[in-house]
Amino acid sequence: MQQTNPAAVGDYLRKLQQEIVAAVEAADGGTCVRDAWQKEPGEALQGSGLTCILEGGALFERAGCGFSQVRGPRLPPSATQNRPELAGAPFEAMGVSLVFHPRNPYVPIVHMNVRMLAALPEGKDPVCWFGGGMDLTPCYGFEDDAVHFHTVCRDALAPFGDDKYPRFKTWCDEYFFLKHRNEQRGIGGIFFDDFAEGGFDNGFALLRSVGNAFLPAYLPIIERRRAMPWGERERAFQLYRRGRYVEFNLVWDRGTHFGLQSGGRTESILLSMPPLASWAYQQQPEPGSPEAALYSDFIVRRDWL
């Protein structure tokens, strides 16, 4: 049986966070606030983390990238839906999670997460599994952006088998779906959870490949769109679409539920929230408009490659 090495995963995740935060600061010109935190003695979870956030920047209205490494006495229900035999076991969880909300409505929202969860059943070997992925949520869709993003995702997974991209792409489409709206959240990407195929070494290698692919997937899209002019109409639609992001994260997202159920740090869990969002009753885009094209051509399940 392969040895598990959670410490190596933690080292990698800290380094990944540093690289991404440096890239955010370089692209925006601003400086992230770095908030190192430690859980208080006696709390349900013990551990620490680093939250990095840039607010009010030239490029990013809000860009948060958090690392956390925590231990808890019992796995919460959201983590054992597929592994009932581990219900109630102590656990260790670590990960990097980010959401970037750009100021320009033509630059898409992006989300990325890579994580490891280790169940620590008494008297037994640790059981480790990995999860994560990345997905893109444009307010205004561009075919070449979608193709680029999905190409980088596919290439990151190629060393692990030809089945991984189509499988994780479908998983992403199914996961980032607003059931109450019957609507995709964005143009998708890749998503995986409870991944333990090939043992610890293979799972960790896949995690690294996905994490390392994030900047090549997103930075070229920023550069293509950041200088596009926009006005009140685009801003209003951006805020309306951000409302969908809020709905998904609070109603459907397992990561949000896991964090809140397990006594996680609320400020870090809600790092994904946009600074501003809006709702309008039964808003319908004008036929033939770029806003209408988002619904008909982009936030639908389709093969981009």
Swiss-Prot record:
Sequence positions that bind a divalent metal cation: H101, H111, H150, H180
Catalysed reactions, as listed in the record: coproporphyrinogen III + O2 + 2 H(+) = protoporphyrinogen IX + 2 CO2 + 2 H2O
Gene Ontology terms: biological process: protoporphyrinogen IX biosynthetic process
Pathway: Porphyrin-containing compound metabolism; protoporphyrin-IX biosynthesis; protoporphyrinogen-IX from coproporphyrinogen-III (O2 route): step 1/1
Swiss-Prot/TrEMBL site (Important for dimerization) positions: H180
EC number of the protein: 1.3.3.3
Coiled-coil ranges from the UniProt annotation: none
Record keyword rRNA processing present: no
Leader sequence segment: none
Highest taxon listed in the record's lineage: Bacteria
Keywords: Cytoplasm, Heme biosynthesis, Metal-binding, Oxidoreductase, Porphyrin biosynthesis
Important for dimerization, as annotated region: 245-280
Active site: H111
Cofactor dependence: a divalent metal cation
Subcellular location, record wording: Cytoplasm
Gene Ontology CC annotations of this record: cytoplasm
Molecular-function GO terms, alphabetical: coproporphyrinogen oxidase activity; metal ion binding; protein homodimerization activity
Subunit structure and binding partners: Homodimer.
Free-text function comment from the UniProt entry: Involved in the heme biosynthesis. Catalyzes the aerobic oxidative decarboxylation of propionate groups of rings A and B of coproporphyrinogen-III to yield the vinyl groups in protoporphyrinogen-IX.
Similarity comment: family membership: Belongs to the aerobic coproporphyrinogen-III oxidase family.
Protein name: Oxygen-dependent coproporphyrinogen-III oxidase
